[in-house]
């Protein structure tokens, strides 16, 4: 069995797949699976050879014995079926359906929301300061799945209302996690079993913490305990290796949420 992963260290969607690989007993890059680091700063995800594998022009892209799988959540579910033990989804059909509903929510809400402060804090000022409107538009036109996102952001980055809305969506996510832990008996989101849901939620929460927005969940005790338990797992340490966070990857450009609040008032 040959597993290859085309990924980026600090990409939240790449991190979801690395967490799943680690939980399936394949934690080591370059040993348990073949690593292909995609440099998003050089737009390697838009090179013809990459687009042949993944026409969406995003990371990650997964290969299993030469067969290509794209989209991080689809890759996670593929790994669950290809490597059934340890199980990361409930066996009960109703519980499994509820787990998939969670995966849909996590894809549509926090995974999307976290991009707003990520670009406000780092990517927009790092990539587009000094660029002309034409250069910015040309860049957006190259991105199959992100063009509308860039058009909404504009060259100046996101404003106060956008960041507050994104933080509100992360807060909603944290409240739902906290309630699910209470309803299901914990310690994990669906109860006693650590699942793909816990893995899928982890990168968005880690990104928010890295940017200094962890005050969002400080009053949610079950959520705080869950987060501490997540960070104690070996899979977390294997996934968030040095350089896997924005603050480590781009220290000269990175701004914490607090710095932005002081500079901009939000």
Label for each model-derived stretch:
Residues 86-91, 113-114, 189-191, 217, ...:
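Short, hydrophobic secondary-structure boundary micro-motifs
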Residues 22, 209, 232:
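Short polybasic/polar patches that bind polyanions
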Residues 110-228:
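GST-like fold's C-terminal all-alpha helical module
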Residues 39, 196, 243-244:
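Short, solvent-exposed turn/loop segments enriched in Gly/Ser/Thr/Pro and often Arg
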Residues 1-144, 183, 257-258, 264-266:
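GST-like domain detector, emphasizing the conserved glutathione-binding G-site
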Residues 218-266:
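Long, positively charged, glycine-interspersed low-complexity recognition regions
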Residues 62, 99, 177, 198, ...:
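Residue-level signal for nonpolar/aromatic packing positions in well-ordered secondary structure
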